[in-house]
Amino acid sequence: MFVDKVKVYVKGGDGGNGMVAFRREKYVPDGGPAGGDGGKGGSVIFKVDEGLRTLMDFRYQRHFKADRGEHGRPKNQHGKNAEDKIVRVPPGTTVIDEQTGQVLADLTHHGQEAIIAKGGRGGRGNTRFATPANPAPELSENGEPGVERDVILELKVLADAGLVGFPSVGKSTLLSVVSSAKPKIAEYHFTTITPNLGVVRVDDGRSFVLADLPGLIEGAHEGIGLGHQFLRHIERTRVIVHVIDMSALEGRDPYDDYVSINEELKAYNLRLMERPQLIVANKMDMPNAAENLERFKEKLTDDHPIFPISALTRDGLQPLLRAIMDTIETTPEFPIYEETETESRVLYKHDKEQDPFVISRADDGAYVLSGAEIEKLFKMTDFSRDESVRRFSRQLRHMGVDEALRQRGAKDGDLVRLLEFEFEFIE
């Protein structure tokens, strides 16, 4: 089964907790703090594997969670960093954040990697908090939570050239005679419902990858017919091979077919019209095909080259294949997404800055604190130790939480809630 769009959940591993410990050794009277830092949580990394062709595996496994880092140890021993979780995807996979719609990565070549969910850093042990004023702190941090998100994976097949046209114009037949591909061929519309790829070898020894894409009908850019399922795959092709049925046996005018298909391509993505397009006049072995081709040429205002062929009798194929190959070699790749990052190994985009906290009122009158930054501080605080609680209180005051609560009307003794933690507001 060909699967080209799935939704998955990914979560980076949490960092390991820092440790509170002290040196207690003979002949070391002033041992001092000796709690180690926690290890870094593993990241979820998507990596391109050229041996994969579909997203089929993701139909059965939709959750990917990296391991958390080890906790810090006594004697200032750092906890072990967790291994990254590598998730293999086929070339041509685009990763999109479901909530924001942001493209996180566009993975096209073998071995390319992108960090999709970054692991949290390890919490600091009490050694890191020692100061001249407090040389023996009973204070440490919990590990930072790893990033978690739902992402949409879209597969857009990687092909040098793509066959487009109305259903039943002979695209699958053409692919089957110029390559070893065996697409399903029948005399009804939408026989092809998934892309088929074939390697085409030209008579001079050169070769290219040709994609037979599902037939297109009017309104496809709005999702009619196979809609976006088809149009998505043509975005990566360098050359568009437009197949037209010159026999007109189905009652459609060949020129009207040509105009309709190009209107759909233009409506879906204007950049598709930048690609070179070759017109294939197919079924020239049928009656009236030659007359229809002459009328087509009279109406055609574009300068796209026309290649009369018969996929069934194989007439005219080699000139067409050589022209496709020549066009591919002189046409650069068209980037789908503009990337500003230059790092070749990984791609990780930081989220836009958000307010550190938001204050709202619950039905019971409590003031509710929320926000990514304040919730991260909460999760990294060890509330089993008084010194950690006092530090958390100072952090809230430094962020301006106390003053913001006063401006919202909070009074002495009012209830304030942050995640599962509740405390009283004190002036």
Curated annotation (Swiss-Prot):
- The principal location of this protein is cytoplasm
Which EC number applies? 3.6.5.-
Residues recorded as binding GTP, renumbered to this chain, are: 165-172, 190-194, 212-215, 282-285, 310-312
* Record domain OBG-type G: where: 159-329
- Required cofactor names: Mg(2+)
Which family is annotated? Belongs to the TRAFAC class OBG-HflX-like GTPase superfamily. OBG GTPase family.
Q: What does this protein do?
A: An essential GTPase which binds GTP, GDP and possibly (p)ppGpp with moderate affinity, with high nucleotide exchange rates and a fairly low GTP hydrolysis rate. Plays a role in control of the cell cycle, stress response, ribosome biogenesis and in those bacteria that undergo differentiation, in morphogenesis control.
Full protein name: GTPase Obg
Instruction: State the organism named in the record.
Output: Halalkalibacterium halodurans (strain ATCC BAA-125 / DSM 18197 / FERM 7344 / JCM 9153 / C-125)
Lineage of the species this protein comes from: Bacteria, Bacillati, Bacillota, Bacilli, Bacillales
In the UniProt record, what gene is named as encoding this protein? obg
